[in-house]
């Protein structure tokens, strides 16, 4: 048996079914290119008979992608198979994937056919698909709830008919790892021609066990895993391919299998899919979540600084991230604060660690996460970090509509001076940002803008989190109001005042160094 596990991605087919709006052909091609760079073996590009748009997408991807084999889905219906072949025939080699429900529940209530009829339908469709290609996959839909005797019968018949890959889906995420592994083991023990096909698995996550079921199946002999990037999919989603891939890599010695995936493309691919599909990745998502390699506990931070393997079973670099992230919070220890100061180029003689750490804890209790510019302000400005903001928003007004250019005016106080400015923008938020930039004199570049709802209904608060770049440094801001534009304005004012403090830090640092040189 081969030690290579084939990675079959169905983000563009099964994953897209979960989206409120379909992806465009251009967007699907972007994802296909990313999957090709990732090293995915099989890309299921769509269900061509379902719509002209899906047909065009599959055809375009089949024409453009050269290093991954393109696959199209078809029911066990002659026209489905013919249309799938037509969409794929531009490629040098391709796969047709036919599926048919095999559980008693589906046979009785959906198909209304006997199991003998189902076997006949499946074998006939496989033979038809083999007219177009020698790479045919057959899926036993709802295999997880199919009686094992029937499952063995149809798998044997499908292989005899010419299927080169047999897929065993846990369509509704019903099985447990022990049970699902047992199904795969039974197939290998009871199907006499099992060695003539690759056994594949396709697990859904309704009970949160899609990845565990897939890994157990590989240990039982399956050599293809199907899933989607970020676990995208209907209901609770599909098996998250990035998790399976990294599980195989991290536990390679135990599992004795590998993939041909370029692991350093994982994070980049995940971010692209999230962006194009408009599906945010949860911070605690395994492998690709923003907290996956972030350490906040002081004990953990101290351990990671001494030896990363104490609390990291894989490196962020292994998935394409640059470095480990130590989040400075009230749970961080002195070692993490000292390390961050060293990373910024400061020596212990430049500041008093005891005083800095005490001030850091006070700020962290109040603010939550402390950033580099906050730390510098504490080190070189002391209590000035706690003083009132330099710039204060008095009011803002916006005007926008479908037939007018968005405009905004702002009034900002700086000490005893009132500054008023107006600007236009690409929407009311952008107009406010342009006006704030003019009023304060800071040319800003918005890097990220994230809006999340806090609560429900008319009284829900809109939290705006932004990252802004100024002179090569990134500054974070947060605003929280029922009015989204107001939240956005507050977030930007937060940034403006952080930038001003960072400038005062530079002034204090120069004074500090001048004093040291004089001594």
UniProtKB/Swiss-Prot annotation:
InterPro entries: 2-IPM_HCS-like (IPR050073), 2-isopropylmalate_synth_dimer (IPR013709), AIPM/Hcit_synth_CS (IPR002034), Aldolase_TIM (IPR013785), LeuA/HCS_post-cat (IPR054691), LeuA_allosteric_dom_sf (IPR036230), LeuA_bact_synth (IPR005671), PYR_CT (IPR000891)
Alphabetical UniProt keywords: Amino-acid biosynthesis, Branched-chain amino acid biosynthesis, Cytoplasm, Leucine biosynthesis, Manganese, Metal-binding, Transferase
Span of domain Pyruvate carboxyltransferase: 5-267
Keyword Methyltransferase attached: no
GO cellular component labels: cytosol
Family matches, as SMART domains: LeuA_dimer
Pathway(s) served: Amino-acid biosynthesis; L-leucine biosynthesis; L-leucine from 3-methyl-2-oxobutanoate: step 1/4
Catalysis: reaction(s): 3-methyl-2-oxobutanoate + acetyl-CoA + H2O = (2S)-2-isopropylmalate + CoA + H(+)
Amino acids binding Mn(2+): 14, 202, 204, 238
Keyword tRNA processing among UniProt keywords: no
A Gene Ontology molecular function term of the record: manganese ion binding
Cofactor(s), names only, from the UniProt record: Mn(2+)
Subcellular location: Cytoplasm
HAMAP family on file: LeuA_type1
Protein purpose: Catalyzes the condensation of the acetyl group of acetyl-CoA with 3-methyl-2-oxobutanoate (2-ketoisovalerate) to form 3-carboxy-3-hydroxy-4-methylpentanoate (2-isopropylmalate).
Subunit details: Homodimer.
UniProt record similarity statement: Belongs to the alpha-IPM synthase/homocitrate synthase family. LeuA type 1 subfamily.
Name used for this protein in its record: 2-isopropylmalate synthase
Gene: leuA
């Amino acid at each position: 048996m081969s030690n290579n596990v084939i990675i079959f991605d169905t983000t563009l087919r099964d994953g897209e079914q979960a989206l409120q709006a379909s992806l465009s052909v251009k967007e699907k091609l972007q994802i296909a290119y990313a999957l090709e760079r990732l090293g995915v073996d099989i890309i299921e590009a769509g269900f061509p008979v379902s719509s002209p748009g899906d047909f065009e997408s599959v055809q375009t991807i089949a024409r453009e992608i050269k290093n991954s084999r393109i696959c199209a889905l078809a029911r066990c219906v002659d026209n489905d198979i013919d249309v799938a072949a037509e969409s794929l025939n531009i490629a040098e080699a391709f796969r047709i994937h036919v599926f048919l429900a095999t559980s008693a529940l589906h046979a009785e209530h959906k198909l209304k056919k006997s199991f003998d009829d189902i076997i006949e339908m499946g074998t006939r469709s496989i033979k038809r698909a083999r007219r177009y290609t020698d790479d045919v996959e057959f899926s036993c839909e709802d295999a997880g709830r199919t009686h094992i005797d029937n499952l063995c019968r149809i798998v044997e018949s499908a292989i005899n008919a010419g299927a080169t890959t047999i897929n065993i889906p846990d369509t509704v995420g019903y099985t447990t790892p022990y049970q699902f592994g047992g199904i795969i083991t039974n197939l290998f023990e009871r199907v006499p021609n099992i060695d003539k096909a690759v056994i594949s698995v396709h697990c859904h996550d309704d009970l949160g066990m899609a990845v565990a079921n897939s890994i157990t199946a590989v240990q039982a002999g399956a050599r293809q895993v199907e899933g989607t990037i970020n676990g995208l999919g209907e209901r609770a989603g599909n098996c998250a391919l990035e998790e399976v891939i990294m599980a195989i890599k991290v536990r390679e010695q135990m599992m004795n299998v590998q993939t041909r995936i370029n692991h350093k493309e994982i994070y980049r691919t995940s971010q692209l899919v999230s962006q194009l599909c408009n599906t945010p990745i949860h911070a605690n998502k395994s492998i690709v979540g923003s907290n996956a390699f972030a350490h906040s506990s002081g004990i953990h931070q101290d351990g990671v600084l001494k030896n990363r393997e104490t609390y990291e079973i894989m490196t962020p670099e292994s998935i394409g991230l640059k470095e480990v992230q130590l989040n400075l919070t009230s749970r961080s220890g002195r070692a993490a604060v000292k390390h961050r100061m060293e990373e910024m180029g400061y020596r212990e003689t430049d500041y008093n660690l005891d005083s800095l750490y005490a001030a850091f804890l006070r700020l962290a209790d109040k603010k939550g996460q402390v950033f580099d510019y906050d730390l510098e302000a504490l080190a070189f400005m002391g209590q000035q970090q706690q003083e009132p903001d330099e710039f204060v928003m008095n009011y803002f007004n916006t005007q926008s509509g479908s037939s007018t250019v968005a405009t905004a005016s702002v009034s900002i106080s700086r000490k005893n001076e009132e500054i008023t400015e107006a600007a236009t923008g690409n929407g009311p938020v952008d107009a406010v940002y342009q006006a704030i930039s003019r009023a304060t004199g800071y040319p800003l570049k918005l890097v990220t803008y994230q809006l999340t709802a806090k609560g429900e209904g008319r009284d829900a608060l809109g939290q705006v989190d932004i990252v802004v770049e100024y002179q090569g440094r990134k500054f974070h801001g947060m605003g929280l109001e029922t009015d989204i534009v107001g939240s956005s304005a507050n977030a930007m004012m937060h940034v403006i005042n952080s930038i001003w403090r960072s400038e005062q830090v530079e002034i204090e640092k120069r004074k500090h160094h001048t004093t040291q040189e004089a001594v």
